């Protein structure tokens, strides 16, 4: 029997039964427990959600900027009041350690919402003089109804990253969470309603991306799609959005990010950064720095520091506050990661630690994969070329700065990059040559609400967070005013 009641759709300010009896299971990856049965939205449900969103958006957009700002701030307060409850649910649904979800997932999502709530009154146009008797003014107007499609690794945070700027700009959003982790997004919908967001302004449709996601991207009255997920799926989303009605898209996609350790780096700091860039959230972070480049003569020393730190990882029940490394998000994803580890072994990478599923005791019930480090890796290996999205670090060696820049950029991805050095001249010189949208110097992973996030190459289109994201949920209308006489050529 499931732990929670049947999870329904959230449409028009409340829970609503789907148009069919079809459901799917929400599974706790730490032990295989069925958390809930979740309804699958139908195409008719998508239409209901769009109609509801259109109605709610008109009410929402007609409010003053200060009214919208106050309502969003109330939602921030409720999120923070319910932080531990939401974090515990996120841990059950994703397998992420409570020590992480309690301090990161809801907290940073609320920070983003608070940031955009403060920017609502700052949405403004320009006045452009043409001549003494004429001028132009511009208006930033909401797009209307937009869609958000989330990934499974940061469910509530991603829902907030997408909905916060969308709602701040006066839009309504229909959000489809990942089929793997749907539960906390439904709670977010409750919170928006409790805060005073009009019915229909934030609807949640659960179901598969192949069905619900496609129906949203193809819908002619949805003006924009904001998607987070894999690159292959992102290409399909972009094609569908453009072919249906030339929708705008924002996409945060896959990565295979380089972390470069230079010869003057503090190796302890470099090892700490590499650990965070590979094993935080059990390695399920799109920006992870999984290609770790180290000078050849420092390889052995660096490897020793990594092995020492891996031994300190506290793998365990994610609900235990002492645990800092939980299971992967699902058993299917575990098999995918284990497949990549097998390829690493087959292709000649040297295994430093990990490399298998954890099966001792209660671990056997869950989707646990040991923190894994390969070294002596080469650029053509599958584990170096493809995104694994799991706890697998690949160590590569290099000789010169020019070589490592070239090899770091030798990828179809361009989401993130980082380097560790004491030489600030080198730091800026190299970072400016790395083909990535998010870069860190002597750090890794922090993404403040004010910081635009997005990728180069096949890692994405557009940016999330920062002022640019708010602007991208508006469209500019130019209005010319003529105060003088008007002369026709006819």
From Swiss-Prot:
Catalytic activity: betaine aldehyde + NAD(+) + H2O = glycine betaine + NADH + 2 H(+)
Pfam family, one: Aldedh
Keyword NAD belongs to the record: yes
A biological process term (GO) from this entry: glycine betaine biosynthetic process from choline
Binding residues for K(+) 2: 246, 457, 460
GO molecular function: betaine-aldehyde dehydrogenase (NAD+) activity; metal ion binding
Pathway: Amine and polyamine biosynthesis; betaine biosynthesis via choline pathway; betaine from betaine aldehyde: step 1/1
Enzyme Commission number, as recorded: 1.2.1.8
Residues annotated as the enzyme's active site: 162, 252, 286, 464
CDD domains for this protein: ALDH_F9_TMBADH
Residue(s) carrying Cysteine sulfenic acid (-SOH): 286
PROSITE patterns with a match to the protein in the record: ALDEHYDE_DEHYDR_CYS, ALDEHYDE_DEHYDR_GLU
InterPro entries per UniProt: Ald_DH/histidinol_DH (IPR016161), Ald_DH_C (IPR016163), Ald_DH_CS_CYS (IPR016160), Ald_DH_CS_GLU (IPR029510), Ald_DH_N (IPR016162), Aldehyde_DH_dom (IPR015590), BADH (IPR011264)
Cofactor, how bound (note): Binds 2 potassium ions per subunit.
Positions that bind K(+) 1: 27, 93, 180
Site entry (Seems to be a necessary countercharge to the potassium cations), positions: 248
Swiss-Prot/TrEMBL keywords: Metal-binding, NAD, NADP, Oxidation, Oxidoreductase, Potassium
Binding site for NAD(+): 150-152, 176-179, 230-233, 254, 286, 387
PANTHER family, alphabetized: ALDEHYDE DEHYDROGENASE-RELATED
Function of the molecule: Involved in the biosynthesis of the osmoprotectant glycine betaine. Catalyzes the irreversible oxidation of betaine aldehyde to the corresponding acid.
Subunit structure, as described in the record: Dimer of dimers.
Family, per entry: Belongs to the aldehyde dehydrogenase family.
Name this polypeptide is given: Betaine aldehyde dehydrogenase
Species of provenance: Pseudomonas fluorescens (strain SBW25)
Taxonomic placement: Bacteria, Pseudomonadati, Pseudomonadota, Gammaproteobacteria, Pseudomonadales
């Amino acid at each position: 029997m499931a732990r929670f009641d049947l999870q329904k759709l959230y449409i028009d300010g409340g829970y609503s039964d789907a148009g069919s009896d079809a459901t799917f299971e929400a599974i706790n990856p730490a032990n295989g427990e069925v958390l809930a049965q979740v309804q699958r939205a139908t195409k008719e449900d998508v239409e209901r959600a769009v109609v509801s969103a259109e109605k709610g958006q008109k009410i929402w957009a007609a409010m003053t900027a200060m009214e919208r700002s106050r309502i969003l701030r109330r939602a921030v307060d409720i999120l923070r009041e319910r932080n531990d409850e939401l974090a515990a649910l996120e841990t059950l649904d994703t397998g992420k350690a409570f020590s992480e979800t309690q301090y990161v997932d809801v907290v940073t999502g609320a920070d983003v919402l608070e940031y955009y709530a403060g920017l609502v009154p700052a949405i403004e146009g320009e006045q452009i003089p043409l001549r003494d008797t004429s001028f132009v003014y511009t208006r930033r107007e909401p797009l209307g109804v937009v869609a958000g499609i989330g990934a499974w690794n940061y469910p509530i945070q991603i829902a907030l990253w997408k909905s916060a700027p969308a709602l701040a700009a006066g839009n309504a959003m229909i959000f489809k969470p990942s089929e793997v982790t749907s539960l906390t997004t439904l709670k977010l919908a409750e919170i928006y309603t409790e805060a005073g967001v009009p019915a229909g302004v934030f609807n949640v449709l659960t179901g598969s991306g192949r069905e619900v996601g496609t129906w949203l991207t193809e819908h002619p009255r949805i003006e924009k799609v904001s998607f987070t997920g894999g690159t292959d799926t992102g290409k399909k989303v972009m094609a569908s959005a453009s072919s249906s009605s030339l929708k705008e898209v924002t996409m945060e996609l896959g990565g295979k990010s380089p972390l470069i350790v230079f010869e003057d780096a503090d190796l302890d700091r470099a090892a700490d950064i590499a650990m965070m860039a590979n094993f935080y959230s059990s390695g399920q972070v799109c920006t992870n720095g999984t290609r770790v480049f180290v000078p050849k003569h420092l390889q052995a020393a660096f490897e020793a520091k990594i092995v020492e730190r891996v031994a300190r990882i506290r793998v365990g029940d994610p609900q235990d506050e002492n645990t800092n490394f939980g299971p992967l998000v699902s058993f299917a994803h575990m098999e995918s990661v284990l497949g990549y580890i097998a390829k690493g072994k087959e292709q000649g990478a040297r295994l430093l630690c990990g490399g298998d599923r954890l099966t001792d005791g209660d671990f056997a019930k869950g989707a646990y994969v040991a923190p894994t480090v390969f070294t002596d890796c080469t650029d053509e290996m599958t584990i170096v070329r493809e995104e694994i999205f799991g706890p697998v670090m690949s160590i590569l060696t290099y000789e010169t700065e020019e070589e490592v820049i070239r090899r770091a950029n030798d990828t179809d991805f361009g989401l993130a990059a980082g380097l560790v050095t004491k030489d600030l001249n080198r730091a800026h010189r190299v970072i400016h040559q790395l083909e990535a949208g998010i870069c860190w110097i002597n750090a890794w992973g922090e993404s403040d609400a004010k910081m635009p996030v997005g990728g180069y190459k096949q890692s994405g289109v557009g940016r999330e967070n920062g002022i640019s994201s708010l602007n991208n949920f508006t469209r500019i209308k130019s209005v010319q005013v003529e105060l003088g006489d008007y002369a026709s050529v006819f």
